[in-house]
Amino acid sequence: MPAVMIQGTGSDVGKSLLVAGLCRAARRRGLSVAPFKPQNMSNNAAVTADGGEIGRAQALQARASGLEPLTDMNPVLLKPESDHGSQVIVQGRRVGTLRARDWFERKPALMAPVLESFARLTAAHDLVIVEGAGSPAEVNLRRGDIANMGFARTAGVPVVLAGDIDRGGVIAQLVGTQAVIDPEDAAMIAGFLVNKFRGDVRLFDEGYRLIEARTGWRGYGVVPFFPEAALLPAEDALDLGRPTGQGALTVAWLAFSRVANFDDLDPLKQEPGLTVRMVRPGQPIPAEADLVILPGTKSTRGDLAFLRAQGWDVDLRAHHRRGGRVLGICGGYQMLGRSVADPEGLEGAPGVTEGLGLLDVETVMHPDKRLTRVAGRHRASGAELTGYEIHIGATEGPDCARPFAEIEGRPEGATSADGRVVGSYLHGMFGADGFRRAFLESLGAATSDLAYDARVETVLDALADHLETHVDVAGLLALAR
């Protein structure tokens, strides 16, 4: 099968970025290439062209490949709902919620849909670049594995192991992985990469040779730190944790415990007229905030309780009294209303949770999940909007008579009577340049000529150039068989 797999010595070593860059490099070689991640765990999901959902990292990799995202690119997606359980998405569709112990019993059965999706991709493309999850060194998770060596051995896909030198101990990461995994698993590893190097790469020559000597693996390169990665859609909410920009207008966003689809904020953090700040648990909402954003969440009622535990409900009311603006997106929109009812217990115990009361609307959860890409117009400015909806529940009430947008002929969202509180189910709205400028101008912010989608394309090309300079890309892609 024409595939090669990038696994890592741990989480956050840069696997997703490496795969995106390799996909773009392969595409520029004239290859039909597709990304594939057997299993992902993320509340940051993308709606696919075939009406399902996958991890947003795979959607970015699809973009790097010149493809529309498809459910086959990430056949198993786990969306954490609590510390002990996750919603399970198989080939784009919700199949239920499992506690961690139940997941480990059920996951071996998911190898069949994983292989089915993989087979469709390999049949349709010259090359498939596979991304692992976490680390194969977590040998306590090896039984029934579908994400790393369990998949690689079953599908016969060679592996390149990536280590992260930025966090230190990369020699131990790589050599140690070989030491703890089964010999049959180790035999699948054809080589290694050292990622996120800072400084003079020549200073690591001895360490690089030592890894080759200790493991017998071929080194495919040392990849210097790529700072432009900050301009790509964030894969982890922590990527947005550092305040960005020094603009006159301050946007604060609330870091819920189950925050989802937080890459809605990416275009804002690149606007020079804004200062974008994450409000972490235990911190107050800054008094200087002009706009407070309540982002999406995987657990609306749970994160409403979390919000109140931080005192953010009090802060939000004070912010509103001072004349501040509030925007709720998806789950954040649901929180802004008078109540959130979950009669079937879709997010926990059945019941009704009192909302923040900043919008005169009510939400009722129901099991039918809305997964769709949409286009329309912002009601206030007339600017074109594009984005996607990914939610359960329906929201109704008097403030819906003042919709945020017109989406494909229907009103969407709600606006308070004073016009300072807005809610919408539309993710990705700030990627639409015209709307973003109009919205920010309505807040009094200085806007720029940022063309967000074009910038993402430029950065993906720069990432491919970066890998071509520092990695034996031709040799690595030649491993595919």
Curated annotation (Swiss-Prot):
A single GO molecular function term of this UniProt record: catalytic activity
Function per UniProt: Catalyzes amidations at positions B, D, E, and G on adenosylcobyrinic A,C-diamide. NH(2) groups are provided by glutamine, and one molecule of ATP is hydrogenolyzed for each amidation.
Pfam families: CbiA, GATase_3
Taxonomic placement: Bacteria, Pseudomonadati, Pseudomonadota, Alphaproteobacteria, Rhodobacterales
Family: Belongs to the CobB/CobQ family. CobQ subfamily.
Protein's recorded name: Cobyric acid synthase
Any one biological process term the GO annotation gives: cobalamin biosynthetic process
Keyword tags: Cobalamin biosynthesis, Glutamine amidotransferase
Annotated pathway: Cofactor biosynthesis; adenosylcobalamin biosynthesis
InterPro entries: Class_I_gatase-like, CobQ/CobB/MinD/ParA_Nub-bd_dom, CobQ_GATase1, CobQ_N, CobQ_synth, GATase_3, P-loop_NTPase
